Amino acid sequence: MKKLFFTTALLGLALAAGAQRIDINNSQNRTEDGFEGWVIGTATQASTTADGITITATIDGTQQGRTLKGEWWKDGVNKYSKLVSDGVGVYGLDASGNTPQLQTGEVGITLTISGLSTGEHSLMAYHNNPSGYNGPKLDVYVGGTLKVQGVEQSNRAQTTTLSGQSYVKFQAQEGQPVVVTYRTTPDPSFDYTQGYNTTSLFINALIFDRPNPLTTASDPTPENTDEHAEVADDNAVTLSWTAAEVARKHHVFVGTAPDALSEVAVTTDASYRLAQANPMNTYYWRIDEEDAAGQTYEGDVWTFRPRRLAFPEAEGYGRFAIGGRGGTVYHVTSLDDDIQNPQPGTFRYGITQVHGPRTIVFDVAGVITLKGRLTCSDKYVTIAGQTAPGRGIMFRGAPFGMQSDGITRFIRMRLGYHNGNVDKGLDGLGMAGNDHAIMDHCSISWTIDEGFSSRNAKNITLQRTLISEALNIADHPNYESGKAHGFAATIGGGELGGLGSSFHHNLLAHNEGRNWSISGGLDGAGAYDGHHDMFNNVCYNWGGRATDGGTHEGQFVANYYKVGPSTTQMALLNAQLEGTGSGTQAYYVSGNIRENLNGSKTQDALNDTYKYTLSGGQKLDWTVFQSEPFFPSYATIETAEQAFQSVLSDVGCNQPELDNHDERMIQETLHGTTSTVGCKSKKKGLIDRETDAEGFEGLNIVDATRPDNWDTDQDGMPDWWEQTMGTNASAADHNDGATELNGYMTNLEQYLDFLAHPHFVAKPNEQIVVDLRPYFAGYTNFEVIDDGERASDGFIYAYEGTTLTARATWAFQQPRVVNVAVRDRQSGNTITRCFYFCLTEAPLPAGIATPTASQPHATGSSALYNLKGQRLSAPNKKGLTIGQGRKFIQK
């Protein structure tokens, strides 16, 4: 079985080969990729050992009233360079333990280095003050001999190239330490006690046995370790760098292993276009610089991975999440949960005990009652809820959170009232702290805190997810008795140097508040942070809060908010300027609609549908509402009215099938109705316990299990699918099949994509009849645009009214795709959805529709299918069809 892993551990091994690299930090969590971390707190001496070399740092000269101290620039670490935005310096130390800046006299740090082999070595150090103080030049001594003088120190440089640097060469004898001292040389004519000045020094990082930075290329693009490198339409990646001062030519080396690079070009330009970059590969590259005399200087090895959409419909800033692509497959075979001793086959085991990139598939359907909060701590995980049989998977009891580069699709979270046990957690699904992650087609309800949270995240997307019926007066332990807290979501995003966060085509129904609560936070400098893109969302029957909160830059575009009987707050967006930070908070508002109780529609109107409020002494000296967007959305944006119909036609966990709760949410939003009343609040639609609605007993989620012969090789793809597609059903080949022609989708990803759309399986000459109305629920009176009969290579399909009929005269190795386009007769709005048809001769296990003996292939037998692509019995004379105990009426 192929495993195409891409991990930072592997990167570290590659980048550290042949050189020791030490990143000096004041926290273990801020080490640059490819470096060994050295955490230094407050002490007169500190030591570390890396790759057999031991380094001890001490204060040079007098130690009285002085101390080593690790320090960091928070904004620099988060936004710019972890390597040079923290380090160790020398500070004063008074009797009370305070550590003031030193502003008089020379200051030095001595490094005693042991373990070096006999011969010539080099040592490069970065000198960048993270505290915002300007320091004097420094000299470097080896064994007491001056080697380099007049090294400039930088102040909060944002890149390694702009940072102060020193470089020395020296001879070492095995068994004897080398002593290197860095000592400042303050200008006697300058008063360092005035302003932000210091006579001290900083060391951020140490790199042994690499060429002088003046002779090597730097500042690579893509950035080193970039796992989402930009790719052109022709799959090319442009490599560029800052040339060394001495360089006249650049030798470009590229490969897919760090120790197997090949020279691909010699150029005088500081760029190279790498053609046909494959997103399944990790690329390593190096630039060797050649000077005017023909001398070449070997550069560092950098690495990147070309980006690719998480799945074909992924949009927004989280669209390039990697997920489990290239990793293993884990099968959930049990609905049990055990916090203390997770068992193989359970979901918790696959999240906490299995490691490395992985795709989690489900061989069971039903309800997983989580006994406690569950958080995925690993990157590169795909949760493929669409693989479950029956009506899919639902979680209850405790929250679940994903990690960076996670892909989460087609799962339900219905938490339920806590009954006094609040320790398990009160929220629903989350992407808190995530970077490059996407959550798609999920359903969340009956939470006690917010249904969804993404605080401190960046580069994320939440799309086509249904958040509904957050329990309103449900005894939240952080609020007084009787307090309403039915919150939909707190959305952080685009923080800590991130580009943005996307929240689009979601349905928020029957939630008292936080529809959304925008949580931009503050950056490391205390300035307002966050970049939020909120578009094409639908909200119905909120209570006292619609969208509020704050962000540095927010886009609120083409959303549709429909007033319900419990709605009291008419403003759709309240930009709350609360005086908690510096800088600005601004918004681009365009194309939104508020549908009022009487059916009238209000367009964007300042101080009506949107407004700002001031508090906390906030001084307003900027324009809050701007006339142009701040950043691109990387998505197709519909009008608000189009979005209303589009979202209601395709939202929530609708694969393998919507449950009756989500069907009710869609219908009540569509028709402006409610069917519940809160037992505490007495508010229509805003429930306080799940028993005010269906309750768990009223949900139509049922247990189901795949047959034993479903997936012989356990690669996530059933045998019938592999036999149809021509892949190997006896050997795991889920990571194969990625080509430029199919968008570099693996075999497994192609199967997951099939399951993510309305899909149907049949034998050749079996006629498939599909009632299209459930797939276009937001279009109450639609017509098919491309009507009539179509035929292509033995595949025939036709429309009659709202019915699609399809048939194939022989089996096909690839599913056939029908793009069904419909038009609303009243609004004129259109939508297109993909329907997949798999026509196969492969044996089909139980659970897949097969023709009966009374319906031979050659007669063109006919079958009616439900939303799961499961065949139902034929309709009777009254148009009534029975399937799995449910009634379907053809009108």
Residue positions per predicted region:
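Extracellular calcium-associated, cysteine-rich motifs in secreted modular proteins
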Residues: R689-V761
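Right-handed parallel beta-helix
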Residues: R307, V367-E495
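Extracellular fibronectin type III
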Residues: E290-R308, T830-I831
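Surface-exposed or secretory-pathway low-complexity segments enriched in glycine-proline
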Residues: T256, N765-T805, R833-F835
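Acidic Gly/Asp/Thr-rich repetitive segments characteristic of extracellular carbohydrate-active
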Residues: F311-I360, N866-S873
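Compositionally biased, intrinsically disordered or flexible polar/acidic segments
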Residues: A19-P213
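All-beta strand scaffolds that present successive hydrophobic residues in beta-strands
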Residues: I360, I383-A384, F395, G406-F410, ...
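N-terminal extracellular ligand-recognition/capping segment immediately after the signal peptide
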Residues: A125, D336-Y349, G356-T382, A388-F395
